[in-house]
Amino acid sequence: MPLAGPLGWMDGRTSLMVSIRLPDQTVKDYPEGTTPREIAAGIGKRLADVAVAAVAQGRIVDLDRPLEPPSPPDSPIDFKVLTPRDADALDVLRHSTAHVMARAILRLFPGTKLAFGPTTSQGYYYDVDSPTRPLTEDDFPAIEAEMARLITAAEPFERFTLPVPEARQFVLDLDQGYKVEHIDDELKSYGIL
């Protein structure tokens, strides 16, 4: 946990506290900006080691995203750490694995365009457009081996948000036109485009 100094938390946090309510109805106070990973570690090392995500205020959140202030402000945040034993964790694990698969495909088949990679009730998939040839089941062993290598490397997942124009440019710079279409479709669904 970061150290507190006379001007607040050394990592830029404020000295405001946020109350969380655990599944056993225990209420604990944490500095605003605390992450679910830090809360899990405070509960126990074993829990932190197996944590997949968390549920805060009814939404699944990643472990490194600071908790948002509750609404209404004086109420505790209902909070639960998700582990592989929780049904909600399965979708998170499948979503993460789809990202690993996409990265493996991009490494093995440079120039591949990624379309959509949703989770399903049966697992996950990724629609891809390979510039040289269609991918087939014969490619699965190599993709699985590259996925295993990526998982063993334990590279962190990094979530970041960008304003829409920057997000569009980011995926354009990656030459991922289907992702630009996806952003535009989302904007249209909200009546923005």
What do the predicted segments below correspond to?
Residues L16-T26:
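Eukaryote-biased recognition of intrinsically disordered, low-complexity regulatory segments
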Residues V61-L82:
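Eukaryotic mixed-charge, acidic/polar low-complexity intrinsically disordered regions
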Residues T120, S130-L193:
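Non-catalytic interaction/regulatory segments
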